[in-house]
């Protein structure tokens, strides 16, 4: 989920407020859904009717944790509530039903709460758009064949699912827990059915990546390339995607005069060459995306199992050849043994084979790159790092999933982007130490935090990375700028930054 400063639910509305249709029903995941239509200033909270304008404290029940947390749900000041409503975690599940006309609502349901929010008949009012966003596959397992999809099927709600969430559901189908596997399969079938019936929205806007959400929503309303940009302004002949080594591909692009901009993706070494040569060639625009060294931060009370599963998925998928792969753990010493144990238990499930099945790990793309990996592993051993498992397979271009417990961040394997299925473990004592060592990295592309608590919030505000993923992995959106800082790149693609990069305005 997002850091606290950027928590998703945003209401774009006119400032003219009035009491609107109150129809909010709050129910646990094991309860039957009922649709309430209330004409007064009340709503159902915990299956009881309450007046929204009387200050009252409610008990927030979490079915997965079987505990109660007390919080203020509604109070008198809601009359003057600003058009920015937050609904994120169990500590922020504020129930509201003060609605204004001419606005769109985006509700984000935290994967930690295990709680469903069912809104009855809101579309029957003047509300134009109600979208419920589920941020991870886990709650969808619970919702897949039950309440929320029934509301989508009968047209009560416009239900949105992010493309990445659908991908995570597919990943959950590999779970060893039969109940999770079956529920994920049902969820995928149901989503496809609703999609083909135009009852579910494929949501490109991603609310999990820390960024300025207001800009993303504003960009959603802007013109689209396909329908509004005239071909004479951006002709196809001026857009090319050459791939290859620096001397044969990148450098000729710089000297090609008709090109107005060069968007580079590749190594930091060649990126430096491109950035030096570009100004010499008719002052071309250049954006550089040159990889990173991203870490997964795991602290006290964090979800170690989730962190291990998603880190292995992010690193071992594509043999680690992904720029935002979370190629290392930064762990509190209290979680170190559990991290190591969980990784060693799960590693054998990643099979090496040439097949293209989704649960198979294939070979390296380039042999020359593969040949550099054993040298880096041997270098780690020479620097007193412990290689706990993995390594190259003889007479092949395969590398078994490799786990290395690193003592210092001065090790070569910690300082360089290895671009391989290798996970390092760096142990720290405090959050401040994690921030200091994380920011010492020469890269600044992405970072991952496993929990939205105090540690997660502190890390999210202090780590010097462009992308911060909280309780999610490998999310991307056309609406959110993508790029890096430090040695991870210069400039950004996608979102508003793409409009700035690929257009020239008349002032």
UniProtKB/Swiss-Prot annotation:
Q: Name one GO cellular component term.
A: mitochondrial matrix
Q: Could you say which residues bind NAD(+) here?
A: 266-271
Q: Which reaction does it catalyse?
A: an aldehyde + NAD(+) + H2O = a carboxylate + NADH + 2 H(+)
Keyword match Transit peptide: yes
Q: In which pathway does it act?
A: Alcohol metabolism; ethanol degradation; acetate from ethanol: step 2/2
Major site of localization recorded for this protein: mitochondrion
- Enzyme class (EC, first level): oxidoreductase
Localization, per the record, is:
Mitochondrion matrix
Any single Pfam family the record assigns to this protein: Aldedh
Q: Which residues form the active site?
A: 289, 323
Whether NAD counts among this entry's keywords is: yes
Domain of life according to the entry: Eukaryota
Q: What is its EC number?
A: 1.2.1.3
Q: Transit peptide: which residues?
A: 1-21
Among the GO molecular function terms of this UniProt record, one is: aldehyde dehydrogenase (NAD+) activity
Q: Which GO terms describe its biological process?
A: ethanol catabolic process
Q: What UniProt keywords are attached to this protein's entry?
A: Mitochondrion, NAD, Oxidoreductase, Transit peptide
Q: Which family does it belong to?
A: Belongs to the aldehyde dehydrogenase family.
PANTHER family in UniProt: ALDEHYDE DEHYDROGENASE-RELATED (PTHR11699)
Q: What does the subunit section of this Swiss-Prot or TrEMBL entry state?
A: Homotetramer.
By what name is this protein known?
A: Aldehyde dehydrogenase 1, mitochondrial
